[in-house]
Amino acid sequence: MFNKKEKNMREDTEKSVVCNHHRISFLGLLVTLGIVFGDIGTSPLYVMKAILHTGETIDESTILGALSCIIWTLTLQTTIKYVCVALRADNNGEGGILALYALLRRLKSKWIYILAIIGASTLLADGIITPAITVTTAIEGLESISPDLPVIPITLAIITIIFFVQRFGTESIGKSFGVFMLLWFLLLGVVGAVSITSYPMILKAFNPYYAVVLLTQSPEWFLILGAVFLCTTGAEALYSDLGHCGRKNITISWAFVKTMLILNYLGQGAWVLNHVPTALSVNPFFSIMPQSMLIFAVIMATGAAIVASQALISGTFSILSEAMNLHFWPRMRIKHPTHVKGQLYIPMINLAMYIGVVLIILLFRDSSHMEAAYGLAITITMLMTTLLLGFYLHSKGVARVFTLLFMGTYCTIEAIFLAANLSKFLAGGWCTMLIGGILFLMMYVWVRAMKIRRHYVCTKPLDDYYQIISDIKADESIPKYASNLVYVNHADKDGAVDDKLLYSIINKQPKRADHYWFINMEFVDTPDTLEYSCKTLVPDTLYSVTMHIGFRIEPRVSLYLRQVVEDLVASKKVDLKSTYPSLRKNGIPGDFRFIIIHRVYYPESSANRQQNLLMSFYTLISKIGIDEPKALGLDTSIVVVERVPLIINQRNRSIRRITQIVNKKEEQKEKGCL
C-alpha cells in the first residue's frame, strides 16, 4: 500500500505575495492601510452628516454625546472586540465569519451553521450598499463647488469603471492603495486637528459621561445611535482581511487609523458647534476643509471611496469562494486575473453586485437616503460573530466567567445597536434586509438540500468488489473503455463507494480499463491545506486517492491527479504506459477518462412536503452555478456525465398480475355462448 500524506500540491504559478506582508515592516503596514481600512476609513464622509439629520436639536450636549458615542463605539466594538479578541480567533492565519465557523464545525452542532450563514448573507448584503454610499457621498462634495453638477451620472460612471476593471485584476494599481490611504488618513487627522483648535472644549467628548447623558435623556437617542453605528461598520471587514496582512500589522496600523479618525470626528464636531445655524444643510466633512483644498478633498474622498469599494468587492469574492467549499453556495466559475495569491474574480457575482449597486443609487438618489439603508445588515453580522466567538472561546478552554462576560457584554451592545437600526427599517433598512434575506434563504436551502442528497446516497463496501473489477479488467471480450478510468466518489465512509459508481462499472455498461481510480474530495476546516493520501487497493489495477482541500483552495482535480500520478510513477508504484503495443513501444502513456455520477432529483418520489420544497428550490438555485466537471476543474473533453435519479423515500408498489382473471372472463363468455 502506498500512503503519501502531507504532500503539498500548491501550484507554481501562484506567488505568495500577501504572506510576505505578514511581517511587521513599513511595507507591511502600508499594504495593511490599503487593504484593511478602506471601509472604516471612509466613515467620516457620512457619519456626522447622518447624526445631524436625525432631527435632534443641535447643541453642545448633543454633539458631545454623539462624539462620545463614536469614540467609545470605536474603542469597545472595533478595538476590544475585533482587534484584541477576534483577530486572535484565526484559522491558520485566516479570519472572517466563515473561517471562524470552519474552526467550530468540528463541534458537530446541528444548528451552528445557521449563525454562519446569517452572518455571511448579511455581510454580503452590506457589500452592496457600501460602494453606493461611499462613492455617492464623495461625489456630493462637488456640490460645495458647483451645486448644478450631475452627481448621479458621475457616481454611476465611477461605479461602472470600478466593476469593469475587476476582470483585469488590481495587482498593478493595488500596490498604490496603501500609499493613497496613508495620505487619506493624514488628511483626515491634520484637517480635524486644525478644526479642533476653533473649539477646544470638544475634547470633553472623550468622557463617556456625555454618551450616557445623551442615551438617557435624548428622545431621539435611537436615531442618533443608529447613525453612530456607521462609524464601525468596517470592523467586520477588518477581521475578514486578517489572512491578507496578519494580526500584528493590523493591530499597529489600527492605532494610527483610530487616532486619525477620532481627530476628524472631533474636528467635524467643533465646526458644527461653531456653525449651528448652517450645519444641517451641508456635510461637515467637506465644510472643515479650507476652500482652497476643496477640490483636492473631493478627489481624495473619491479615491478613498474607490479603495473601500474595491476592498468590499474583493472581500465578497473571497467570502463566496469560501462558501462554495463549505457547501453553502453553488459552485460558480472563478477566474484568477493575476498571479497574486487569493485574488479572485467571479463574473456572475461581479455583474450581480454591479446591478445591485446601480439600483440602490437610482432608488435612493442621494447619500442621506442611503444612510437609512446602511448599518442594519452589518449589525446582524456582528451579532453572529459575537455568538461564534463565544463558542470559540469556550472550545479553547477560556474561563467560563470571561466567556459569559464577553458574550453578555457584546450581545447587549449589539442588540441595542440592532434595535436602533431597526428604527430605520421603513426608511431604507428593508433594502439590505431583503437582499440579506434572499441570500440567507439560498444558503439555507443549499445546505439542507446537500444534506438530503448525501443522506440518500447508498454506499457499499468497496472490498466486496475487488475481484469482479479485476475480472472485468482481464476480460478481453469486453471492449476497452479507457486506459485509466477515474471516478469521483461521494461516499463519506472510509472504504465505501457509491453504489451507482459500481453500477456504472459493472452493470450499466461493463467498463474495462487498465487502471481504476476512485477520487474522494475532502474539504477540511483549515484554509490552505492541499494534500493527498493514496492507497493501492488492487496492485496495478485499483487505486483510491483522497484529496484534502482547504476551504480557500479552488478544486482543480485534473491538475492535482496529474501530480499524484507523477509521484506514483516516480516511485514505481504504477506503470502508466499504454498497453497498446504500438504506443507502449514509443513510451506513450495511457489515456484518462473521468466519469461523474450526477443525481437528478425525481419529483415523483415519496418525499414529504418540506423535502420536496427544498429540493425544488435547490434545483432552481443550482442553475446559477456550473456543472460538476467544471466545478472540479476537469477537462470536459474527457469527462462523461452519467445521470441517475435521486429518489427520496421510495415506496415500491408491486404490479398485480391479472392473467388468471382474464382467463376466467373468457371462460364465462364461452359458457354464455353455449
Which residues make up each language-model segment?
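The structured alpha-helical core of multi-pass membrane proteins
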Residues: 2-674
